[in-house]
Structure formats: C-alpha cells, structure tokens
C-alpha cells in the first residue's frame, strides 16, 4: 500500500519503513499493551497512521520504548518464510501461538489480519526477547510437521466417495461426540475434515478410534444397501447336484451363490441347455 511519506507518523518515527506489519504492531501495542483508547479504522489507512502518531506524541516514553523494542523483539520477515500464506497451516499455527503467548487480542484490527499475519502479530506483541521468540518459532515449526503426520489417519476418506464418507463421519460425530461438533461448521470434504480435527483437541489415538468406528458404520451401510438389491431364496438340491456345485465353486474359487448366478445369467444369454417351450 502506497502511503504519504510526509504524514504525521513518518515525522514521528523518522527512518522507519512503516510497513503494514510495523503499523499493525504499533497500533496493537498502543491499544492492547498501553491501553490507549483508539478509534476503529482501516489497517494502515491515513486515519490509523495519524492516530498512532498523535498517541506517540502524547507519550514520548512509549515512543522511546517502541524504538528499542523494534530492534530487539521483532523477528525478521525471513524467520516466517516457511509459513504458508493461507490454508490449514497458518490457521493452526496462529491458534497454537495464541495458546503459547497467552495473548487474547480483542482488537478489531487484529481480526482483519490473515491467519499468517495474526501469527506474526502475536510473536511481535509477545513480551519476550529476540532469542526466546526465535526458539519458540522453531519449536512451532517442528510441532506443525509432527501434527501434519497425523493426516495419514484420514487417508481412507480420499477416494471417489470422499463427500459421502465425510457426510457419514459428520453424522457419526454429531451423534456420538457432540462436544466436538458443537458450534462447528459441518465438513463436506477431506480438507475441511482435516481442519476440523486440527482444532478438535483429539489425540491421534482418539482420531484413529473415531475413523475405525466410522469405517465400520460405512461397511454396515454398504452391506445393507447391497442386501436391498438381493432377495434370499431357499431351495433343496439333490445330493449329486450339490456335490457338483461344491466342485465347481472350488475349481473356480467362487462362492456357491456366485456359481449359480453365473450359470443362470449365462443360460439366459446363450440359451445352451434349457429347451425352449413351444409358444401356445
């Protein structure tokens, strides 16, 4: 975003690049840490920049502290280069960073930031020195790598029946684990399911248990669907015919039912053995 370099904020902080990250940090420090009342406005707008400048002018002690903090507390952009711009990863990381830092930021400006920007803002606002932040971010990277490994638990969902399986999974969870689904949006595809479990608090063992039960429900449902398409018949075969049926089933590695099905359909198609009845 292009801004006027001669605005009040540039005058108040000469030599600063005043990137959106820095402007957001200044605003959030003043609002959240210093408890200075600020009027809501758009991120990095001239109105925001002027409000920050006036607040700093009224509080020179705060200004001096921020100048020192910028060089000792803000990690370089390169430290966050591994964080994706959007998607599951930055959302999970931001949630974890919120827990790690203990910061609960209610600012409307913070809510307008992307998940990645929120992650960076949390680290910027966290009252720790450069080295501690660097170590915490490195551990967070490792935690994400470990967390993402659990995606394998849900590989069963990835096929042509993905949406149907996800619908069944949501239905099962809603009925059997209402605590997890309360106030959550129903998921309809695998990516949404993964994001749901990112923030569910469920352990890998619990996830595996849930998937196993959902798979059983799926198998039961499929068995019932197939049963609707079939009808059971009970009939008596002579012992000699029964023996032949067993022999055919064994030779062709088929079930007795499958042998009968193939013979009947074959006769219908080729008319080799049953004589046609004369029409009346």
List where the protein language model places each region.
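Charged, low-complexity intrinsically disordered terminal regions and linker tails
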Residues: 1-225
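Aromatic-residue detector
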Residues: 86, 99, 114, 238-239, ...
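Generic alpha-helical structural element
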Residues: 179-182, 234, 249
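Generic hydrophobic/packing signal
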Residues: 204, 208-213, 217, 235-236, ...
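Intrinsically disordered, low-complexity regulatory regions enriched in Ser/Pro/Gly/Thr
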Residues: 227-228, 252
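Short amphipathic alpha-helix starts
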Residues: 229-246
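Short, basic amphipathic alpha-helical segments that act as recognition/interaction helices
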Residues: 242-244, 248-280
